[in-house]
Structure formats: structure tokens, C-alpha cells
Design a protein with these regions (language model features):
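Conserved structural motif at the start of ABC-family nucleotide-binding domains
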Residues: 2, 17-19, 72
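The feature captures the beta-strand-to-loop junction immediately N-terminal to the Walker
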Residues: 30-35
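Conserved ABC transporter NBD signature motif
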Residues: 56-71
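ABC-family P-loop ATPase nucleotide-binding domains
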Residues: 79-135
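Catalytic Walker B motif of ABC-type/P-loop ATPase nucleotide-binding domains
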Residues: 148-152
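Helical segment within the ABC ATPase nucleotide-binding domain
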Residues: 163-176
């Protein structure tokens, strides 16, 4: 279970997150809905341990995320803005991920790369935006995360690939009881895939 309690964050005297409470049950998919600027990306950065709230707490099955390297091994993150080192291929990135994540699954990586028809030897800089999303998905899912954080994960993907991505996520939730947070502004798509939905506006949870 992921639990966020009374989380608040201010940048340059501007509140970005305010007294935020949210719970993601184990083995469920939680959809976080909000327009651009609602605070979705900032919240995900806190949940991944990249930022620390001014107040409040974020725990994963009772463990705080901040400065917890052991817990971060169990968290998969696909941000909205992807970064890959210049000149690296998907195979190069595989070497980095497999050396860092203890639960790396080589078969899972190759299975997903084949599913998306990605050339592991090709330079990622030659990939389209959608292909880069698929590459990130292959890498992150192969770490076998217990918790998956996705920031606008389906932007730039065609309908067929979207279905493949969602199927892989749903299968892992069913098979491994993975817990998932998905942020999006697409209410219709979230309603069809998520167990729970929260609506975020100006850093506050309006409705769950």
C-alpha cells in the first residue's frame, strides 16, 4: 500500500501541493486526473523520492521513500519527459538497468522489446517519441517493480501500442499484485483501466 498523508510543497512561496491525502491499495491501478499544472508531475516526483515535501509523509507499506535506496529498487518510474544519454542504444540502456536493479529480468526485457518491435541495437535518439516511451516501458517493466509510477505514459502512442501497454500493466497487477499510479488528463481512458480515480486541482485532491 502506498500512503500519502498531509503532503504539502511550496516553490518560491507558491503552494504546489496542499495537505494532500491519498492511498493506493496493493495490487490496484490508481488514476490521477488533472489538467496541466494541477500538480501531478510534482506529486510523482515526491512519490519517487526525487523531492521531499515541506510537510507530510509518503510511505510504501510503512516505509518512507525519502533517501531510502532499498525501497527505490522496488519502484519503477516513467516520467512524462524522458531522458536517455546521447548515443546510447536500447541495448546500452539494458546494461545500465540490469547492473543497477537487483530484480532485473532479462527474459521480460527481450519479450517486451520484441512485442513492441524495437531494435535493441538502434540508437534511441533515432526513435520517435512513441518509440522512446516504449523503450522506457521495456526497461522499467523488466526491473519487476512492486510499485509503478507513470506520468502521462500513453501520450504519443498509437491505439494498438496503447492496448499492448495496458495489457502488460494489467497482467503484472494480476500476477504480481503490482501497485500502479497513472497520471493523465484523459478521463475516459482512465475510467476504463483504473480501479480508483482521484481528481487533482491546484495541488489539492478534489475527489476520489
Amino acid at each position: 500500500m502506498i500512503r500519502i498523508q498531509k503532503l504539502s510543497k511550496t516553490f518560491d512561496r507558491t503552494p504546489v501541493l496542499t495537505d494532500l491525502n491519498m492511498t493506493i491499495q496493493t495490487g490496484s491501478i490508481y488514476g490521477l486526473i488533472g489538467v496541466n499544472g494541477a500538480g501531478k508531475t510534482t506529486l510523482i516526483k515526491h512519490m519517487s523520492g526525487m523531492l521531499k515535501g515541506d510537510e507530510g509523509s509518503i510511505t510504501y507499506d510503512g516505509e518512507p521513500i525519502w533517501e531510502n535506496d532499498t525501497l527505490k529498487q522496488c519502484i519503477g518510474l516513467i516520467p512524462d519527459e524522458l531522458y536517455f544519454p546521447n548515443g546510447y542504444s536500447l541495448r546500452d540502456m539494458r546494461s545500465i538497468y540490469s547492473g543497477f536493479y537487483e530484480n532485473w529480468n532479462e527474459d521480460r526485457f527481450h519479450q517486451l522489446a520484441g512485442l513492441f518491435k524495437l531494435d535493441e541495437k538502434a540508437k534511441i535518439r533515432t526513435f520517435s517519441k512513441g518509440m522512446k516511451k516504449q523503450a522506457a516501458f521495456c526497461l522499467v517493466m523488466a526491473t519487476m517493480p512492486a510499485y509503478l509510477l507513470l506520468d502521462e505514459p500513453i501520450d504519443g502512442l498509437d491505439p494498438i501500442v496503447r492496448k499492448l501497454v495496458w495489457k502488460a500493466i494489467v497482467d503484472d497487477v494480476a500476477d504480481r499484485r503490482m501497485s500502479v499510479l497513472v497520471s493523465s488528463h484523459n478521463v475516459k481512458e482512465m475510467e476504463g483501466i483504473c480501479d480508483y480515480i482521484g481528481i487533482l486541482s491546484h495541488g489539492r485532491m478534489l475527489m476520489e
